[in-house]
Amino acid sequence: MKTQRLFSILLFLLFISVHTYAQPQLTEPIPSLKPGKYQKDQIKRKYGMFIHFGINTFHNEEWTDGSKPAASYMPSRIDARQWVETAKKAGMKYIILVTKHHEGFCLWDSKYTEYDVANSGNQTNVVEEVAKECKRQGIELGLYYSLWDRTQNADVKDLSKDEAYNKYMLGQINELIDMVQKHTKIVEFWFDGGWEKSNQRWPIQQLYSTIKAKAPQCQVGINWSIGLPDNPDYHPVLPENQKEGFPIRYFPSAFRLGDPYLPATPDPKLFTHNGKTYYMPWESTVCISGKWFYHTEDTTYKTVDELAGLYVKATAQDNILILNTPPNRDGQLRERDVKLLTDLAKKLNLK
């Protein structure tokens, strides 16, 4: 009888270990006045492609609220090969792919939600296809993930829902890391939407530790990264207003974000948390046209000269640029975008 009971307990423990993720050891960046090893790698990458693609692509909207049915996402194809090939030929060293935007629609088959590609008009696992292509073509991959989720956590004022939603997020981050790293390393996590709650309500420490435990090379950044000395959670502190020693709004993190702004000149690099100083480069995000997501009426394009000027300013001072190039409803980058990137690479002599 005791043996049978012990066996039942062992089975239960095995079930728990299989169906939950172990809590990682808490880790933090090392205080430093200079860039660390992986920050140097990030600075060396210098230039990448930002890819906004998802359910918003099919509604001519930048932000939707989670009410659009998954079936309305229906690209005729997913030409991940073209996306990666275009980035590589443009002299870009990596891609940042939007995996889930504010509405909560996931570009992979997630076991945590039905609001994903598996229940849509095209069931291709976009995240995995891009990961495979990045590996095949020799370009690095980072992932964008919105903390704010208007499907799973629409009522952000209800603090009682934080614990369940934080578990949901951590589960999805584990899911993404495990899936992508079967094919290629993840070099960056780009988090967004933190302004919808006070910074202390987000599980930044757990997210950072989870990522670093499985992907130590991965750099973690949260949009609108810096606060004010008298209000560390102030939103937003523009680049020109950031001063050396200002508090890190979302700690731990490794680099600064504040889209769509470019860094100040001179650009401060040293910021603080609990009396310690950390080096943090700036990553700029710039749209090649007028929108983040593809819109049928988006006909405003920057010129090659404009883009060249933005590139020079954004990548000076050991900073980084990702240029947003959104695929259309056929799952391809627009011909005009491809030509602009090609012409820009020639002008800047990028390889």
Regions from the PLM with identified roles:
Residues M1-P24:
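Bacterial Sec-dependent N-terminal signal peptides
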Residues Q23-K351:
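Mature catalytic domains of secreted/periplasmic carbohydrate-active enzymes
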